[in-house]
Amino acid sequence: AAGRIGHAYLFTGTRGTGKTTCAKIFAKAVNCLDTTSPDPCGKCEICKGIDSGSIMDIIEMDAASNNGVDDIRDLRDEVAYLPSVCKYKVYIIDEVHMLSTAAFNALLKTMEEPPEHVIFILATTEVQKVPVTILSRCQRYDFTRITADDIAKRLLYVAGEEKIDLDENAAQLIGRLADGAMRDALSILDTCAGVDNKVDEALVRRMAGVTDRGYLFEISDAINAHDSVTALEKIAELRQQSVDMRRLCMELAGHYRNLMLCA
C-alpha cells in the first residue's frame, strides 16, 4: 500500500456498522511491522499495542464531547510531532459532524497541508452536516446497514468463541432487532448471555421486550374480526409484561406486511 495512502478518510454510515472498528484496523494496516501483506498481522508489537490502546500514536477523539476550536487547535499543535513508534500517527475523530464551525475551520487548515506522517480518519453518522470543504479533502467510504443474516452468522461465530449456547432462531431474531448495527446485536447477545448461557428465542424476546408472535396473531385476528375488546385486552397484557408499545406498533406493521406477502 506504500505510496497509495491518503492523508484523510471519511467513514460514514449509520451507528454500529463498524466505522470506528475499521478505522482501528486501518491504523494497524498502515503501521503493521509485517509488510508482506496489506492486511495487519495482528501479532506484531504495533498491532497488539493498537488493540490494547497502549500505542500513543493512534489518537481517538470524540467530537461529541471535544467539539470546540481549542480542542482542534491542541490537535493541530500535536500533529507536528513525529510518531513515537509507528510509521504514521492516525487521528480517529468520531462523530466529526458535532464539531463547531470554528473547529471545522481549524481542522481544515491542518488538512490542507498535513504532515507526511499524519492520517486523519473522520467518522460520522450525519455526513450532510460535514462542510463541503472538509469532504473535498477526504476519501469517502460509505458503511451500509449489515443484513440480518450476516449479523446472525457473526453472532453464532462469536457465541462459539465465547462458549455461549446460542440458538440459530435466536441469532436470527437478534439480527432483525439490531436493524443493521452489529454493535447493537453484540450488546443484545451480551445482555442475554448475562442472564442465561443458553440463549434461545424466548429469552431474546423477553430481554429485548419483543412481542411473542402468538400475541401478534391474536391481536391481528381480533382486529380483523372487529373485536376491539379482545384486541385491547391482549395489548393490555403485553403492557403489563413491560413490552414497549412503540415496538409493538412496528411489529404489528411488520406482521401485517408478512401476511400480505403470504396472501
Question: What label would you give each PLM region?
Answer:
Residues 28, 52-56, 74, 87, ...:
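Extended, largely alpha-helical regulatory/partner-binding modules appended to the mid-to-C-terminal parts
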